[in-house]
């Protein structure tokens, strides 16, 4: 545990050192005045001329929301078409055929919504062109969408008596040109220097030193495993002495996969694969890349509203929640797994099942907490192999609404929604009209807040309930009992909250799960973005109220505690009954 606490402390210090200047830089990028941060001005203006965009024309919240939805719908259609036509397109050295319609739909929605749920195996499904032109491009655009939306909300707080919240196309372009692309280039070059591959070669067939005998599951005509009368998978012995090594442009996609809190990797093993994450140093940089923009945006928030203490308060609430849950996950994994107690496995160091020896329990536990605190979903260990209490942590982090740092942009606007709720609750307790950053919280704002908070629990709980009842949903569950329920609950929690990680024991690449999870991903993204933009518009139109003796300070320890309490209260009341049927019951049964 001491090793974990040391690595956690080093991680947080380095993150803070990097995030603060990046936050100040983004304040200049998205500010209303000309800034030295606009160092790529000629490139930016060229994009506007080509696209026919007037960067001086600002938008009301409805126009802004329409632009967000239109660009993402077009993106989803483009990714879908690319997958369906990839067998006729270049940069497909393995000759992969068209992706099935249901999987194409799921993948298109997944990458457009910044979820990156992957029901397929990337190295055996997607061509290089599909990975680069479809998935990697959406890694940039979905992250840029999240940043644009949170910047619009911040402008709503910063402005007063205004009818506009900015220009989506300007925010979208600046997010990509000034933030995402430069960071991705730096990180990509670093990854290449550490051994992450970057090429367009065909896959390599190599001969192994010794032959390998393994149990190969038998598949039916639809590609699903055949089960015996007891429900166990039917296998047959197979032997091989060759191995296929996948190639591809990995480093370039790996960088934006992390920086944009996307999470979907070119390989099925994701960041556990040595071609994506070869050593402890790349692992540490990947963890930094996940949190760097969400943390920096807290400083951008403080800078744009003219009070840096506001950003510190939000960052403090996020950090407290993160540290507590990270320590709990590490504690659970540093203990032996009761399921393996009777198998004669040496668990003196803790639960090593599903973890890479080059990372160990400490780095794997920290990575698992970071990737689910942010809406990233990349993994360097298999979450399905975590202990019951260990698996509880990433699931609960997602169910909190991905607000503990959260996704790029989405984490901060999600936490600001909770800040509005916290101020409203405080106002009720002291009998004053609630206000936040000088803006009065009224009926419309609370309606939008309620919608934004309640959408994902509705999708998660209803989706899980349907999946464990209907035949198509139950067919994908291979682990009976509480763990099987946990796998389904995790899948819908991940999809609706746009995380993308999985308890991979669930067979989710089926028409039922592809459609159900795809719908959850889309609604979980845009059913929150629209209310957030609506609040941005109403806040911008309001007058700024002067600070009085009765105004609740929203920059001190009391507000931090109130904000944390609001997040936990909603999460606990909503999900504890479902969690009691899954990981909690699984732990008690052992």
UniProtKB/Swiss-Prot annotation:
Keyword GTP-binding in annotation: no
GO cellular component terms, A-Z: plasma membrane
HAMAP family membership: KdpA (MF_00275)
Gene Ontology terms, MF aspect: P-type potassium transmembrane transporter activity; potassium ion binding
Ranges that cross the membrane: 3-23, 63-83, 134-154, 177-197, 284-304, 312-332, 359-379, 388-408, 411-431, 451-471, 515-535, 558-578
Record's protein name: Potassium-transporting ATPase potassium-binding subunit
Keywords noted in UniProt: Cell inner membrane, Cell membrane, Ion transport, Membrane, Potassium, Potassium transport, Transmembrane, Transmembrane helix, Transport
Subunit field text: The system is composed of three essential subunits: KdpA, KdpB and KdpC.
Main location: membrane
Cited InterPro entries: KdpA (IPR004623)
One Pfam family in the UniProt entry: KdpA
Its biological purpose: Part of the high-affinity ATP-driven potassium transport (or Kdp) system, which catalyzes the hydrolysis of ATP coupled with the electrogenic transport of potassium into the cytoplasm. This subunit binds the periplasmic potassium ions and delivers the ions to the membrane domain of KdpB through an intramembrane tunnel.
Gene: kdpA
Membrane protein topology class: Multi-pass membrane protein
Localization per Swiss-Prot or TrEMBL: Cell inner membrane
Family according to the record: Belongs to the KdpA family.
